Amino acid sequence: MTQPGRLISFEGIDGSGKSTQARRLAEHLRDTGRDPLLTREPGGSPGAEDIRRLLVEGDPDRWSPETELLLFTAARRDHLERLIQPALAEGRDVITDRFADSTRVYQGATRGDLRALVDQLHSLMIGREPDLTFVIDMPPELALTRGLARASGEDRFEEFGLPFQTALRAGFLDLARANPDRCVVIDGNRPEAEVAADVIAHLTVAA
């Protein structure tokens, strides 16, 4: 019987470097002979990528917090069904750039105090947590500058400004403190290679 893979998520505010660290961890696992699946949220599966464009592009006030929450949950459900669960069942590790914790922080803590509804929808439609979560922490002033400098067109959340990013950082740190069994806070305000080495060291300890 195939041993299920691990679901490993990377979380943090926009511009924190979590996407880079997710990619570097996937490369490390490939170098050690594993076959990880690197994915992202919102998105990952074709249907979820369609929803992603609705969420990350356009005017900051395009959606109400409630509508935004439903869109994120729909994207995550499709991602889980079509990509994450099949890969885990094959014994592959899945590394995802964001998962449910982002919804808890973005929609639950900063976009209308919807945390109870976030948790209810997660229980009904998703029903699982990552095995390990890396929260890449960075001063919001620096992260916001980096995020806007990308000019990717996917900057709807960055456009909410510094107070929003500051609230997000506090939300992620609170969430990590509340879930010490699976969450590891990593100082992202260092050279990329140092951050990656720290991630790998914690992964080895948790294995």
Curated annotation (Swiss-Prot):
Its EC number is 2.7.4.9. It catalyses: dTMP + ATP = dTDP + ADP. GO terms for cellular component: cytosol. CDD domains: TMPK. GO terms for biological process: dTDP biosynthetic process; dTTP biosynthetic process; dUDP biosynthetic process. It is an enzyme of class 2 (transferase). It comes from the Bacteria. GO terms for molecular function: ATP binding; dTMP kinase activity. SUPFAM superfamilies: P-loop containing nucleoside triphosphate hydrolases. Keywords: ATP-binding, Kinase, Nucleotide biosynthesis, Nucleotide-binding, Transferase. ATP binds at residues 12-19. Residues 11-49 are annotated as: Disordered. Gene3D superfamilies: P-loop containing nucleotide triphosphate hydrolases (3.40.50.300). Pfam families: Thymidylate_kin. Residues 24-38 have a biased composition (Basic and acidic residues). NCBIfam families: DTMP_kinase (TIGR00041). Phosphorylation of dTMP to form dTDP in both de novo and salvage pathways of dTTP synthesis. HAMAP family: Thymidylate_kinase. Belongs to the thymidylate kinase family. This is Thymidylate kinase. It comes from Dinoroseobacter shibae (strain DSM 16493 / NCIMB 14021 / DFL 12).
